[in-house]
């Protein structure tokens, strides 16, 4: 039986590729997709979800737009990484269908309520929508199997020295998610920076030769440019968000540890930092499965294998 999931995302090149991977995988049943503000403005990320589903010929999946700003802060976007549209690079179709009239939280709640089994929430942007869901629908917590997030880091930040972008955008929301009591799986920079796509991998995807693999290669061509900056020391581009879907499909290619994680919301230098109690110093019970390593080749092979689905 396929695993039911809701994807909350802010496309974003790597979010788009996470959608491609999820919808090529019969092991997963994508019951709804909601958009969050983050990589671009809320209007653009919602439009990008609709453009990707139009491209993938999946207008049957319910879509709803989410919160227009973080819980307690002004919105920050990453247009320097993802371009003016949020998905600069390839020529993507215009949306062929409209989103639902309700909000992301309403669609998530309806999906959870109607599901016969608990649903996994995959969240690849800021945690605003998920936090609003948890706060407004405590009666639905038992319908959530787990929350798999791309966000945070045990070690280094990528937006500030201490903070990863998704968590930095809305640290209060992330803290609600981590302390919710629902199992959380964290794909942070510790693992996503090891899930790099190299130039040769992009050519491998392009050579698959179907329309979707070609678009993925073109998305990666654009995404690669930002990551060529010498300050990162990368060989390729880290494919952050697809790590969440890849973990659901092939957990054996990831190394994880069980740890307590809290989010710093006040610090002078550390706002948005995910504080991981690696050495069990707090006495707090672990609340997260934290990814720390990945078999890079296994990750690339999984992407290549699933891109064949679109032949």
From Swiss-Prot:
GO molecular function: purine nucleosidase activity; uridine nucleosidase activity
Gene3D superfamilies linked: Ribonucleoside hydrolase-like
Hydrolase in keyword set: yes
Gene that specifies this protein: rihA
HAMAP family noted in UniProt: Pyrim_hydro_RihA
InterPro entries in the record: I/U_nuclsd_hydro_CS, Inosine/uridine_hydrolase_dom, IUNH, Pyrim_hydro_RihA, Ribo_hydro-like
Protein purpose: Hydrolyzes cytidine or uridine to ribose and cytosine or uracil, respectively.
PROSITE patterns from the UniProt entry: IUNH
Biological processes, Gene Ontology terms: nucleobase-containing small molecule interconversion; purine nucleoside catabolic process; pyrimidine nucleobase metabolic process
Organism lineage: Bacteria, Pseudomonadati, Pseudomonadota, Gammaproteobacteria, Enterobacterales
Keywords: Glycosidase, Hydrolase
Record NCBIfam families: PRK10443.1 (NF007761)
Enzyme Commission code(s) on record: 3.2.-.-
Enzyme class: hydrolase
Pfam families: IU_nuc_hydro (PF01156)
One Gene Ontology cellular component annotation held by this UniProt entry: cytosol
Name of the molecule in the record: Pyrimidine-specific ribonucleoside hydrolase RihA
Transmembrane stretches, start-end: none
Domain of life: Bacteria
Similarity-based family: Belongs to the IUNH family. RihA subfamily.
Active-site feature positions: 240
């Amino acid at each position: 039986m396929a695993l039911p999931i809701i994807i909350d995302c802010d496309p974003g090149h790597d979010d788009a590729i996470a959608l491609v991977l999820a919808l090529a995988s019969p092991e997963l049943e994508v019951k709804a997709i909601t958009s969050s503000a983050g990589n671009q403005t809320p209007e653009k990320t919602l439009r990008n979800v609709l453009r990707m589903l139009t491209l993938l010929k999946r207008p049957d999946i319910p879509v709803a737009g989410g919160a227009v700003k973080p819980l307690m802060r002004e919105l920050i976007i990453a247009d320097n990484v993802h371009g003016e549209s949020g998905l600069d690079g390839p020529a993507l179709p215009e949306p062929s269908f409209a989103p639902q009239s309700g909000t992301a939280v309403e669609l998530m709640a309806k999906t959870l309520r109607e599901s016969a089994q608990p649903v996994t929430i995959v969240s690849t942007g800021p945690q605003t929508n998920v936090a609003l869901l948890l706060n407004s629908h405590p009666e639905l917590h038992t319908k959530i199997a787990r929350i798999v997030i791309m966000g945070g880091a045990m070690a280094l930040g990528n937006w500030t020295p201490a903070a990863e972008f998704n968590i930095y955008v809305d640290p209060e929301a992330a803290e609600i998610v981590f302390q919710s009591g629902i199992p959380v799986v964290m794909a942070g920079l510790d693992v996503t920076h090891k899930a790099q796509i190299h130039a040769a991998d992009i050519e491998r995807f392009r050579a698959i030769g179907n329309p979707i693999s070609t678009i993925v290669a073109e998305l990666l061509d654009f995404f690669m440019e930002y990551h060529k900056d010498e300050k990162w020391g990368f060989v390729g581009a880290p494919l952050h968000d697809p790590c969440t879907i890849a973990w659901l499909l092939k957990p054996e290619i990831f190394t994880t540890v069980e740890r307590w994680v809290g989010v710093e919301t006040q610090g002078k230098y550390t706002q948005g930092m995910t504080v991981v109690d690696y050495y069990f110093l707090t006495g707090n019970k672990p609340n997260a499965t934290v990814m720390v390593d990945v078999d890079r080749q296994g990750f690339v092979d999984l992407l290549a294998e699933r891109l064949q689905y679109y032949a």
